[in-house]
């Protein structure tokens, strides 16, 4: 785990403009600042970039936490920043979602969820490394919010031409980086596990996790 933290820090810290991949649903990265980030009323407080392009959205949900106990560790309560899916399509959002991955060394990674779905995260030619985080035990379960599917096949006559549609606001790697407003986040969007608003004057940690799992029928492949 320490080696992965070091690699991520080297890629992202001090405005390096590097890139990391979060993998499939639930994969996450946590950021810690050298100062608290104030919740400025009436303004966005965070700007988080990804590598989204038109029809290539891979939205990640943002969570925030305040270092209440002052120990410098992300072990205080976490709160999700509510995004547009909670307004535009709440009936299609799966809250309290759970997915479990099983280690199969250097092979496709099988998974099951609490919605009676199953599939595999397929290996591809672009990423040769082990897909399962070997510093964690198998089985590995992630819990969170599952956003509505954003993949649309625009191919004709049986052709495959998948587009990943963007949500209106509130997610990382959802809109191109030149959309400053679309990649900015308000700490005032924070909600608790019951989706009730939470008042935070400042935060010390930010977490981004991948919030989709697409299943390609009939192969049950995931991406």
Predicted regions and their residues:
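Short N-terminal edge-element motif at the start of the domain
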Residues: 2-67
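Residue-level detector of conserved catalytic or cofactor/ligand-binding positions
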Residues: 213-219
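Extracellular Ig-like/FN3 beta-sandwich strand-entry sites
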Residues: 201-203
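Acidic, glycine-anchored loop motifs typical of Ca2+
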Residues: 68-77, 93-95, 101
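Extracytoplasmic, non-cytosolic globular domains
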Residues: 57-64, 72-86
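A Trp-anchored, charged/polar loop motif used as the substrate-binding/catalytic surface
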Residues: 180-196
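Short beta-strand-plus-loop segments that form exposed binding edges in beta-rich domains
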Residues: 208-212
